[in-house]
Structures are given as C-alpha cells and as structure tokens.
Amino acid sequence: GTDYTSTADLADKTVVAEAGSAGEAAISEDENLSKADYVSKSVQTDCLMEVAAGTADAAVLDLTLANAMIGEGTDYANLKIVDELNAEEYGVAFRKGSDAAAAVDAAFDELKADGTMQALADKYDLALAD
C-alpha cells in the first residue's frame, strides 16, 4: 500500500516526469508538486523504472501509458495509479468539407456501428468521447 492521499504528501519527495510533457507541466502548476524534488527523464518509461527502483517516490505520466504499463500482468505489477491530476483531450483537424474529413468520419461511424471502437476502448481501458 501507499500512504499517499494527495499531492501534499509529495511536497518533499522525489517526483519524476518526462521532460517537456504534460506531466512536467502538471508538476510545475500544482501547488504541492512544485515543492517536490523534480527530476526530468527523457521518456516516460524511465520514470516508471525510477519509481520501481526506489530512486523516485512518484511519477507523473500519461494515464493511457500508465494503464497499459502498471499493475497485474505487467513489468510494473508492484506499482499502482493512485491519482489523476488532469484530463487531456486530443483531436484531429481536417479542412471542413475535405475528402479526408469525410473518409475519417465515415470510418469512425463504421467502427462505432460495428462495435470495433468500443471493443478497442474496452481492451485498452479507455473511455470513448461523446
């Protein structure tokens, strides 16, 4: 188990994140995490290695990656996700009315209709956007 209950518990601890990432921004923007001993890493997987090795107390990284790499059946079965700091949403932009936009919309509609998109979301522990 962990004694972690909020970011206040990490104010004097070593926290790692990927340099230039949203995790790094979250650390600098959080009142408590900004007081932590922050160590930047070149890739998010290095952050997990630091926590697993005990050289860092916590890592701030993308939730999708964390869900895929942490927990039972992974190389980091002894680690767990204990908090979500913020949500990021991404989109893809096309010129309005373009053939590319129409093709992608049609593909998404088909993947939703036949259940493929939901199956992929379930497989990777993701939530579909509305």
Q: Residues of each region from the PLM?
A:
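Short helices/loops that flank or line small-molecule/ion binding pockets
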Residues: 8-11, 29, 44-60, 64-65, ...
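Short helix-initiation/N-cap motifs at beta->coil->alpha
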Residues: 2-3, 39-53, 88
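Short, well-ordered beta-strand segments
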Residues: 14-17, 59, 93
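Flexible hinge/capping segments at coil-to-helix
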Residues: 1-14
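Periplasmic-binding protein-like
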Residues: 63, 67, 71-109, 127-130
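Stable alpha-helical elements in mature extracytoplasmic
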Residues: 6, 23-26, 43-47, 62-66, ...
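Ligand-binding clefts/hinges and TM-proximal coupling segments of bilobed small-molecule sensing domains
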Residues: 22-39, 77-84, 106-130
